[in-house]
Regions:
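Core alpha/beta nucleotide-donor-binding catalytic domains of modification enzymes
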Residues: 1-131
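ATP/NTP-dependent adenylation/nucleotidyl-transfer catalytic domains that generate, transfer
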Residues: 121-176
Length: 176
């Protein structure tokens, strides 16, 4: 696909299970760690400034539900930050099924992390059991509603941080 669309591609092959064992983490965490390390290498090598990740609205809802179950504050209610340093997430307002439908209509294949189907991970149980239950039995638009709530909570957090920063500056003359 990259060759067909003339998009540069760099492929890394890593032993995720070995890395996980060596670093005392789950394969899910190890895969994420390795991907991020590789992304940063390519960013530097190619002189980029941002790395776009494919997190979508369903991922964000999984994060919200997981945060709620563990207890969270306003930051956790905002879900995944759309921009965090070099990391950008332009698909947070798009549902997984919309992305899959788009790809299917165009005959574009995609791959997913193999750990995504492993029910040992709580995030996967939220994805495979809780969210479908909410959509089937509570509200078919549960994901959209939670997505909009997270947007508002994220904006509220940003507003509070800005206001606190300005107040701190006015009281102390200290700038961030």
């Amino acid at each position: 696909l990259c060759r067909q669309w003339n998009v540069r591609l760099k492929v890394y092959r890593e032993n995720v299970p070995a890395y996980a064992k060596e670093h005392g983490m789950t394969e899910e965490e190890a895969g994420r760690d390795i991907r991020r390390t590789c992304f940063c290498k390519v960013l530097k090598e190619w002189g980029g400034t941002k790395i776009a990740l494919a997190h979508h609205e369903n991922d964000n809802v999984e994060t919200l539900l997981w945060n709620l179950c563990r207890g969270t504050g306003i930051r956790g209610l905002g879900g995944i930050a759309p921009v965090n340093d070099v990391w950008i997430r332009p698909l947070l307002c798009v549902k997984r099924r919309e992305i899959e439908s788009y790809l299917k209509k165009r005959g574009i294949s995609y791959c997913t992390d193999t750990t995504n189907a492993d029910r040992r991970y709580m995030r996967n149980r939220i994805r495979m059991d809780v969210i479908p239950y909410l959509e089937d039995c509570v509200n078919t638009e549960s994901v959209s509603h939670m997505g909009k709530t997270m947007e508002r909570m994220y904006e509220l957090e940003q507003y509070i941080l800005e206001e606190v920063g300005q107040y701190k500056e006015s009281c102390t003359g200290w700038k961030n």
